[in-house]
């Protein structure tokens, strides 16, 4: 009897795939993610970036006081208002938010390259702001993928931004970029929180 058992074990060992259940396919398993948790993560990143932007804008006002509105024609126009919150749809919000934030990302890059010596004292803060913007952009792209939403159209080639005409021009541009980004992020937090209730 022992000989028979040993013989059976030897035979079975020659074909392990016949007796061992197949394991998971190669590669990382696809874990289904809760869309509400993904949206929560995007909201937290947006709030954090909003706080950073508000703080940096306050530093700008302290170091370089400048009354009045500061505009930059190349910046995106705020697409939404309080009156349109009720009609928001998730695909449109995420797509527009990603496009607008990509524009601000490029403007911050430009500001770091083109700004004169006057803004060099804010270089660490501008660098951190750019890194957080990039992180939020990746999160939004992931969220759109997880929710199986239509992906944004390929980004159009960015129009090169010319250097500021003067040191004052770079300061005005910084005020405009930070002010516009602050408004966009403030709207984004409100819109994303409202859309979360509809998931």
From Swiss-Prot:
GO CC annotation terms, alphabetical: cytoplasm; extracellular space
UniProt-annotated site: Important for interaction with IL6ST and for the stimulation of cell proliferation, residues: 168
Keyword Signal: yes
Role summary: Cytokine that stimulates the proliferation of hematopoietic stem cells and megakaryocyte progenitor cells and induces megakaryocyte maturation resulting in increased platelet production. Also promotes the proliferation of hepatocytes in response to liver damage. Binding to its receptor formed by IL6ST and IL11RA activates a signaling cascade that promotes cell proliferation. Signaling leads to the activation of intracellular protein kinases and the phosphorylation of STAT3.
Alphabetized GO MF terms: cytokine activity; growth factor activity; interleukin-11 receptor binding
PANTHER family registered for this protein in UniProt: INTERLEUKIN 11 (PTHR16922), INTERLEUKIN-11 (PTHR16922:SF0)
Subunit comment: Interacts with IL11RA to associate with IL6ST, giving rise to a multimeric signaling complex.
Coiled coil: none
Subcellular location: Secreted
Residues spanning the signal sequence: 1-21
Similarity remark: Belongs to the IL-6 superfamily.
InterPro entries recorded: 4_helix_cytokine-like_core, IL-11, IL-11_mml
An example Gene Ontology biological process: cell population proliferation
Source organism (scientific name): Rattus norvegicus
UniProt keyword annotations, A-Z: Cytokine, Growth factor, Secreted, Signal
Region (Important for interaction with IL11RA and for the stimulation of cell proliferation): 182-190
Protein name from the UniProt record: Interleukin-11
Encoding gene, per UniProt annotation: Il11
